[in-house]
Amino acid sequence: MRKKVGIIGGGASGMMAAVTAAGAADVTILEHTARIGKKILSTGNGKCNYTNRTLSKDDYYCDHPSFVAHALSQFDDQAASAFFAAHGMLTSEKRDGYCYPYTGQAATVLNVLRMLLEEKGVTVKTEQKIEGVTAGKDGFIVKTRTDRYRFDKLILACGGNAAPQTGSDGSGYALAKSLGHTLRRPYPALTYLLTKDPACKELAGVRANALLTLYVDGEKVQMEEGELQLNKDSLSGIPVFQLSHRAVQALAAKKKTTISVDFLPQLGEEELLHMLTELQKQYRKQPVEEVLALFLNKKICGALLHRLSLPFQQEMQTVSDKQLKKLAKLCRHFVFEMSGYPGFDKAQVTMGGVPVSEIDDTMQSGKVRNLYFAGEIIDVDGRCGGYNLQWAWTSGYIAGLHCCDQENVSENRETERESR
């Protein structure tokens, strides 16, 4: 007799779990919004960066990296690309290993999954607000505002708190807790960072390639290079997103959090000083601002001069050697103190969730038999660049595969958790 598998959450991980399980079970997705897969449509600026060719466990934040490594060994970036290619989606690979549908439209990825669900006979129930889940010897009872369902196996793929406008409202956390699981406090990740530094106001609108270094209580923590976007009260752009996990953790813990910006990462400090010295000889009578603008955005020039209290129109020949050294140093170490971070509505993913120490390598709960987890509800979050969607595919595939096994409880589950 075919088992009944219920999946709470119709996002990327829930749909992958459903497609995987559908061949061996009767699968029902319960989605609390009016449509499935809404968050997929906003990924990659609407282009859906669905995985990354540089994939490794080091691209994820997780208390037990071996958990992620084992999961990726079962379904990695090549498996994800092969899956979509096998179902008709042409793909393209961009810089840094970013992979997209060839159409450049996130809807293509969603349509593959949506059509597969229909072809495989998966029942999709939308607008199902979950009111409670009860686990018993005979399976699970899921109560919604309008219906009552019984399942032999249950997969929680409810997502996190990030981007609540797409349906990710954190409701799955309460369900996990009601079934005996603990929770790592959720925080926004892959987000911009706030600052009260007045320099941001004059730098608003600037985009510049830069090397960013995150310091927490004076200790260097992480470095990222890419296009920095400066706004009137925040730093943004991919390098900031990459720093945001550790920065948000530090800010939440009330630690001093600063980001040092190198506006000329292609030059060493001595090389830059030599260049400034030569330019001083060449343009003796020219305003220092105009000379700096030969290689820096003019707004950046203004911020540098303001911070050093140098007049914009001061002639280069009157700038002292000491001032030139300070200018060279500031170009490569322009420090912003961060004051906070925005809410979940401005974040791409959630850090925190159900600890992996409570989940085995089949994505099954270590507390409740036949309960599985997939996606962002698990305390695993990745870097920007397709890694979080890959985690959705990976964890969804593993949960969907193993929830259909006749004997799906690992006898070594306790050993697995203790070894991580």
Residue ranges of predicted features:
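Glycine-rich loop(s) and the adjacent beta-strand/alpha-helix scaffold that form part
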Residues: 153-199
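Short hydrophobic core segments
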Residues: 6-8, 130, 149-165, 176, ...
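Glycine-rich active-site loop/strand segments that organize a redox cofactor
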Residues: 45-93
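A glycine-rich dinucleotide-binding beta-alpha-beta segment and adjacent secondary-structure elements
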Residues: 125-126, 301-381
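A conserved short coil-to-beta-strand element within the FAD-binding core of flavoproteins
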Residues: 126-139
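An anion/pyrophosphate-binding glycine-rich loop and adjacent beta-alpha core
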Residues: 34-36, 41-42, 50-57, 182-185, ...
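Glycine-rich FAD pyrophosphate-binding loop
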Residues: 22-45
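N-terminal Rossmann-like FAD-binding beta1-loop-alpha1 element of flavoenzymes
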Residues: 3-29, 399-404
